[in-house]
Structure formats: C-alpha cells, structure tokens
C-alpha cells in the first residue's frame, strides 16, 4: 500500500510576517492542494479541523490541548486578532485522512504541566496506524521522554501492524526504538514501523503560512 504522509505545525493559524487576519481559507486551500493521504497537524485552532477536512475531502479526528477554557470567547478574539491572541486562542492537534476510512481513534495524555501534551492516533480501515505528537518545547529532556512514551504507546496499539508516528517533536535529532526515521526538517519528523519510504522526505512550499515547513514523505509496504 502506498501512503503519502504530511506533518505540519500550523502555528495557531498564523503567518510570518503577521497577516493580521483569519487565515483559515489560506491554510485550507494549501492543504487541499497538496497530494497527501494522511496529514498530521499540530497547533491547530480547535474550530479548524472540520473545515480543513471538508476542503480537502478528508475525514478528521482531533485532540484538544491547552488554553481551551471559555473557547467561544477565545475563538471570537482569535478570529478577529489572531496575531494578538497567538496560542491564547486555544489549540488542538488533528489527523486528516483522505481516500480512506478512519476505523478507530485513541489518545494518551503525556503530561499536564506546564502544558497538556497528548498523543493521539487513528487506525485506518486498511489496518495501518498513524499517530500524531506535539512534544514539550524548550525542555529537551521532557520532549525526549514524551517521544519515548508516544513511541511505546503507538507500537502497543498497533500490535505488529504497520504504523506511522509523526509531528513536532521539538527535538532536531532523535532515535526511537522500534522505528525507522523516514525523514524530517528541523524539529518536525516522521517515523515508520513497517512501511518504507519510496523517496527522500521533502518540504512543501507554504509561502508565509506558519513558522514551520510542511514535511512530506511517501511510504510503501
């Protein structure tokens, strides 16, 4: 089975330099225009995944992360002033799956403080598992522990089935037991257990959207 996997930190829906407006249509158009089967997304405004999935013709699952109290108020302010609100607008991580069916969704809280960090994963109808992580920033030891926890949990859920683990690990270099590094850029990585990359991972042209580059790799197996 051939599978194109994308990981992208959306920077809470912001741009560099600041755009001063709601960028949901821009991010949705970018994602819809790229040729992927799985998109692992971090720092996503919580009201975005459904719209992103609709634009891309995909299914979606999300896990709420931090700063989501009084979300309707946060949403209103973040839509009007995204560059002022930044992460204060609330956040989630999301997985989008295109051209297939999501059969199962699981999640695991990795820590509560200083911010909630979650692993979440989907099982596709084909049996492949795909897991999404955004690890703690500015604390390499904690980020490494969270990556190890995420690695072990995903392998346990997959129970020998092919699996993908990707996201923003907040580590430029790392190795995970039981996984092969399929590729990455800066702190964003994609690991595989079973499938093999058919070509080198590469970044996509994202213009001014986000402070992270989208990373894409095609897998087979």
Where are these regions (language model features)?
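Extreme N-terminal starter segment of soluble prokaryotic enzymes
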Residues: 1-7, 128
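Acidic/histidine-rich helix-loop elements
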Residues: 7-23, 136-140
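Active-site metal-binding loops of divalent metal-dependent hydrolases
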Residues: 8-10, 44, 133-135, 167-169, ...
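Active-site charged/polar residues at nucleotide-handling catalytic sites that mediate phosphoryl
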Residues: 34
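Active-site neighborhood of phospho(di)ester-bond hydrolases with catalytic His/Asp-centered motifs
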Residues: 39-42, 61-63, 164-168, 191
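Structured beta-strand-rich core segments of catalytic domains in phosphoester-bond hydrolases
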Residues: 44-127
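Metal-dependent phosphoester-hydrolase catalytic domains
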Residues: 100-111, 141, 145, 152-164, ...
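Metal-dependent phosphoester/phosphodiester hydrolase catalytic core
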Residues: 127-128, 133-141
């Amino acid at each position: 089975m051939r599978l194109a996997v994308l990981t992208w930190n959306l920077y809470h829906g912001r741009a560099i330099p600041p755009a001063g407006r709601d960028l949901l249509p821009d991010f949705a158009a970018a994602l819809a225009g790229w040729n992927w089967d799985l998109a692992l997304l971090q720092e996503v405004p919580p009201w975005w995944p459904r719209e992103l999935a609709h634009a891309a013709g995909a299914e979606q699952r999300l896990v709420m992360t931090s700063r989501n109290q009084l979300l309707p108020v946060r949403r209103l302010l973040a839509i009007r002033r995204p560059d002022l609100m930044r992460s204060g607008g609330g956040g989630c991580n999301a997985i989008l799956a295109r051209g297939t069916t999501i059969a199962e969704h699981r999640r695991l809280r990795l820590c509560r403080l200083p911010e909630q960090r979650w692993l979440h994963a989907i099982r596709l109808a084909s049996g492949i598992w795909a897991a999404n992580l955004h690890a703690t920033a500015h604390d390499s030891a904690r980020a490494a522990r969270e990556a190890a926890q995420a690695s072990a949990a995903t392998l346990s859920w997959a129970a020998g089935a092919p699996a993908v683990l990707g996201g923003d690990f907040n580590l430029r270099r790392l190795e995970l037991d039981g996984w092969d590094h399929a590729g990455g850029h800066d702190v964003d990585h994609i690991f595989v257990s079973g499938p093999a990359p058919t070509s080198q991972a590469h970044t996509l042209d994202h213009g001014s959207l986000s402070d992270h580059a989208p990373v894409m790799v095609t897998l087979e197996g």
